[in-house]
Swiss-Prot record:
Its EC number is 3.6.4.13. This is Putative helicase mov-10-B.1. GO terms for molecular function: 5'-3' RNA helicase activity; ATP binding; ATP hydrolysis activity; RNA binding. The lineage of its organism: Eukaryota, Metazoa, Chordata, Craniata, Vertebrata. Transmembrane segments: none annotated. Belongs to the DNA2/NAM7 helicase family. SDE3 subfamily. GO terms for biological process: miRNA-mediated gene silencing by mRNA destabilization; regulatory ncRNA-mediated post-transcriptional gene silencing. GO terms for cellular component: cytosol; P granule; P-body. Residues 91-103, 113-123 have a biased composition (Polar residues). The gene is mov10b.1. It is found in: Cytoplasm, P-body. It comes from Danio rerio (Zebrafish). ATP binds at residues 550-557. InterPro entries: AAA+_ATPase, DNA2/NAM7-like_C, DNA2/NAM7_AAA_11, MOV-10-like_beta-barrel, MOV-10/SDE3_DEXXQ/H-box, Mov-10_helical, MOV-10_Ig-like, MOV-10_N. The keyword Signal does not apply.
Amino acid sequence: MSRKYRKKLSRDDIRAVGFDFIEFLDDRETRSTTDRNTLKEIYNEQFRDRDGVRDPNFSSVLFALTRSSRTRVTRSEVFFDKKIRVRQNDQWSRPYRSQQNHATPHLNDAISRPSTTRVSDPSSVPEPENRVIARRRLAKTIMRQGNSEDMSVFFADKYGVRVSSELQIEDGKIHWCVEGAEVHELKLFVENTGQEAILFTCFSALHYLQYFTLDDSQRVRKDNPHRLEPNETYEVILRFKSDQIGVYPATLAFEFKENQDTRPFHIVRFIEAQHRSELTAQLGPTEPFRPKRLDTNQPMKWSIDEGFKPESSSQNFLKFVVPLDNYNCPSYTSALIEVLKGNRSSGKQLQEHQLTLESDLSFNNYMDRFDLLLYLEEDQMRMDIKRYNKKDVSMVRDRDKKLLVLELPGVSENRPSVLRGDHLLLTKSEELQNSNVTKYKGYVHRVELDQVKLGFSKRLLERFIDNMKFSVEFTINRLPLRLQHRAVHMVVQHHLKDVLFPVASRRLNPVSPSALRLFDQKLEKNPEQKTAVCNIVAGTSKPAPYLVFGPPGTGKTVTIVEAIKQVEKNTGGARILACAPSNSAADQLGEKLITSQHVDARNIYRIYASSRNPKEIPKVLENNSNVEGENIIFPCKEDLMPYKIVVCTLVTAGRLVSGGFPVGHFSHIFVDEAGHAVEPEIVISVAGLLNAETGQLVLAGDPKQLGPILRSPFAIKYGLGLSLLERLMTQNELYQKGDTGFDNRYVTKLLQNYRSHPSILKVPNELFYDNELKACADEISSRQYCTWEHLPKRGFPVIFHGVVGKDERESTSPSFFNTSEIDKIMDYLKKLLLTQAKKGIAKISPKDIGIIAPYRKQVEKIRQAIKIHRELKSLSGIEELKVGSVEEFQGQERKVIIVSTVRSSKEHIILDDKFNIGFLKNEKRFNVAVTRAKALLIMVGNPIILRTDEIWGRFMNYCIQERGYTGYDITHLEETDVIAERLLSLNIRQEITVETEESVVQQFLSPPWRHEH
């Protein structure tokens, strides 16, 4: 390689050269030298440029080392940190597995014999050589060749030389499983199977090694090559030692020459040492990952055999006055998707639709744009629900002979959502190949845990035999989609431009501070909460919505409840509709209003959808709701209208529109958790109910937390995932933060956090909330774990436990899991639950602990680990310990939160980034996960991977600075050889991919299907 300047080096690159130089000095036993001029002379004359690539100047290297706090420099002397280790440093993420096997290729195959021309190859000069330079040269030689050659050439045995081991080579890698913290040895065999002797010139790791050492009997080096005779085998021993469960890779290169006059050739081996426990072995992949394409084929013809519907458990006196159309997906939807994918050209109509999607949202395109976005989302929903379709399943008769029982694992968690009155389509397995089949429609009568009881026609029941085989087809419930379509159409009809695209308040003069006396005296001491309540009552923003920006733990729901009570008391003729996206959030509003005793309970009414299970309704709400015994009753409009406060979900608010409630009946509409809903869902509660001239819309939420879960990549791309709350705060001038803060006439940001210990709150506060949040949590509860004996630092209840694991997949599930992280999580659970109530730490219940993981498969594996753990599985209340995704924890809190980040492979981060899944590259998911904890936060993850992300790197550095880091040794993480990053490309295997119509969200996250009606 001719001498040339590198491309512009990063600070990390230059620092890596500095660490190489320190190791070079250590090799020469001159590390104790401190004279600056002497070191500069050694650097320039003995070290610099020795690998054929121009290194940075000495001053640049010193500057990079100084910035990393590893070197102290004066005018005349340089002092290197004594803690900098040499030789055995570096870990990076697990490389891809190669598809190539290491069989010896024929010499006449793709590999040509080395040139016999004598050359001055810098990697083959047979002179005494410093091992740092030797390693750097060897690595760069291989990387240089790798830019132009088939990567499989490096893995292949060649010219009669074979490099093998005691273990089998799988997918181009030696998998080495070890248990225990003692030293483990792996023998590598270098064998000459040819007819001529070969020079074995050197072997080396192509990067710094941590936890590994290499050894051989004759100390083979370039200046001490070993002549490998025909049929001779030479042993190289790789030793590994670590007390940390995890996965540790090593990349080794072996160099050979046919004689002194030929160019060297290389054989590369990847070793993956997996230090595992009994638990990690049990949780490993059940079978290799084989992606599976969804079966989307349908028979040419079919007929529907109508089933037996359940008797209505609801009595409907609320007559339909406003029609609700079907809003079926138009025929062009599939073609539009192909255009958006770039798979086909577009005609005039499709071009217009594409232009609508690519245009900014406005009142003029509001209806058309949201119609298109909802069509795109529905199309993907129809595809994703097929993930749950089943083949060759059997049913049995129920005790009620009119019903058949079908086992559906996952239905209790809404994967998928199946409600009373929904239907499934079943086809006899034996008829699937017929050109014309019968699909039996089975109506859901009851859902009991993971069983559903279905009502079919007499025709099927008469022919049914227990354990008869069927294929099962799931369908989506279109009611929420239909209501959203109608709502965006009604936006135009009811002239809601000033509400959805506000330009100013109609108040000419600002309102003076109100003299309201708040019911909740705690709010009197919180200026932001009081301001929000007063301005909502005064209507300072009308006709624009009033926003309550509520960061985690700041009491936004309490603020909304207080505002509702004050409006009811102080605004004559007020009628209030209080909504939320979920039943749980709506129930919380209702409970707080009824139990406050500041509003006559007879004026509050909670409306449930007919699909709601009466057994799940909170006792405190039963007498103030449309539940009577085991039935849901819809009162007539005349009976509902006198109530001053009506509470329901956003979807159920559409029932009020259908029932003919007059526009303007509700003077105020409140939406809590407004950031969780797509804009058309919010609009269900507004269009047809709110008078734009006189009404007040109030939205409460946090645009810095997760928004609604969507499945269609195009619906996400073109903005359906942007809630109305976030759209106003990011795109409307009225809600922008100025030099003096937000304009309180339109928005109030709550600042006092009543949940978390200050150390837990610090990083998200700085990253997302302009460092304005104030830690106001109760000191006794928030400091409960400050003296816990397992904290790395007393008084700092945040732990970052570094684990270098492996993100794996199994069977046909594309979702990831990491058993090394699970092992460490079980260790922390034992410490929390089995050795508690000691040393001043109060006893904790499993229900006060939450475990968060980004991928569905990790959630499942953690649950499995708890069930098989000898000590944890029988613990009282262990079933109440919640394990779930970030989305499932949003809006919740726990005393202790444990987070598993899963990611340990750099190649998969690209996937996370592209599709906005996982923790990395999704700052909202990070924010929600961190801010759930009240007293103790434990993060378990790969520090090498996480430090590459700006947000995670910030959090990790914070933990290191506060001495809250433990686990994998990162003392020398900055000494990582830059070449190691590039070596990953040598071992990249293109994983088997199958084109599937299933969304990435469904594949990796498998979120529960919403059933909030």
